[in-house]
């Protein structure tokens, strides 16, 4: 039997690529509370903590997209007294970092700033301010600029600026999750 054009096209079709959407969920695998060191009421400078991390492998994915969600609880107790203008301030910087092939990159940062102050406009009376806070801090970020391969993503918090005397300052119950969407090749 000879292979003519009709016979070949009706009996044989070359494999074509099709794409199947896949979605994965990754959860952080090493959550750590950030307990800031305080010396005689003063928060020590330059403290940084990795709150949670996760690993994502996009090497088999076409057009990967990653949606990150991070949540935590920020807690502090601070005071300022014996001044006509007492102030308590907490300034934290949260950073989502990606580490691929040993190269670290900050994808996005968020600032948490809480400032309380009262004042005596006549500057005669010494006032006192005491604050105790426990509130959630949550962020969402989508990453589209993804290089194929295995990368670690981590959420970091840094102490930036503080006013007042503190009993404690901490970021607790950190949770980092990622939804990974992409397409895998399906030959048929």
Question: What is each residue range found by the language model?
Answer:
Residues 2-188:
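Extracellular jelly-roll beta-sandwich "head" domains, especially the C-terminal globular C1q domain
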């Amino acid at each position: 039997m000879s292979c003519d054009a009709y016979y070949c096209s009706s009996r044989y079709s070359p494999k074509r690529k099709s794409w199947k959407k896949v979605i994965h969920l990754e959860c952080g695998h090493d959550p750590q509370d950030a307990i800031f060191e305080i010396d005689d009421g003063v928060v020590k400078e330059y403290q940084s903590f990795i709150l949670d991390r996760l690993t994502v492998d996009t090497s088999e994915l076409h057009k990967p997209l990653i949606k990150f969600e991070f949540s935590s609880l920020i807690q502090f107790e601070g005071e300022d007294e014996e001044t006509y203008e007492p102030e308590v301030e907490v300034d934290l910087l949260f950073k989502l970092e990606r580490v691929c092939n040993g190269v670290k990159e900050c994808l996005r940062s968020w600032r948490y700033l809480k400032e309380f102050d009262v004042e005596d406009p006549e500057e005669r009376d010494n006032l006192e301010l005491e604050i105790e806070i426990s509130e959630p801090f949550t962020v969402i970020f989508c990453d589209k600029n993804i290089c194929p391969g295995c990368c670690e993503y981590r959420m970091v918090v840094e102490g930036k600026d503080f006013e007042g005397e503190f009993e404690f300052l901490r970021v607790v119950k950190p949770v980092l999750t990622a939804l990974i969407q992409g397409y895998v090749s399906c030959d048929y």
